[in-house]
Amino acid sequence: DRVYQIDRGKRRLLGVVDGRRVKSLLRFFRDFGKERCAKIKVVCSDMWRPYLKVIEKKLPEALNVLDRFHIAKKLSEAVDQVRREEVKSLQKEGYEPILKKARYCFLKLLENLTDGQLDKLADITRYDLRTNRAYFLKEAFDGFWKYNSPQWARWFLRKWCARTMRSRLEPMKKFVRTLRKHEDLLMNYFKAGKTYN
């Protein structure tokens, strides 16, 4: 893992943490020094619990913002898990393999899909599939980042989470449980002026 300094559009590598281990991150903070650590106002991290604990301990005054990329990755993994389960289920029941070779149709941003992927996605979304429900929930979640008001963003997040928990899609529900555990850290994105991600 890498540690960067990001100031008003400037990005500078501060250090490389050896592997994904707590000891490595603790060593980074020790080497970085207490004085410099005290000057850190915002830190951007993923949701890995050991890192969150170290950041809370070593940077108690810093605002921890969850990285949008990691949240999007976890959500995409949940959608893909729904897709994989449904591929197996449809195969077992003897249906045509419509979801085969469609993985990236559900994982890529809509604007990054090729014409062929757009056609395949349009064809697939005509069916009543669990994968489609997961995909539409994923697309709807993107609206969270567009809010300017933290209060409205929190309202949206809670509504989206409640709707997703009713979806009967276990991988999506697991993602929601993770989000709910970190709701305050997620909302820090707005406290930080939507500039860190």
Model-derived segments and their meaning:
Residues I71-K92:
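Short alpha-helix plus adjacent loop in nuclease-associated cores
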Residues D1-Y4:
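Two-metal-ion RNase H-like nuclease active-site motif
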Residues D7-R12, L26-R27, D31-L63, F69-K73, ...:
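Acidic/histidine-rich catalytic cores and adjacent linkers
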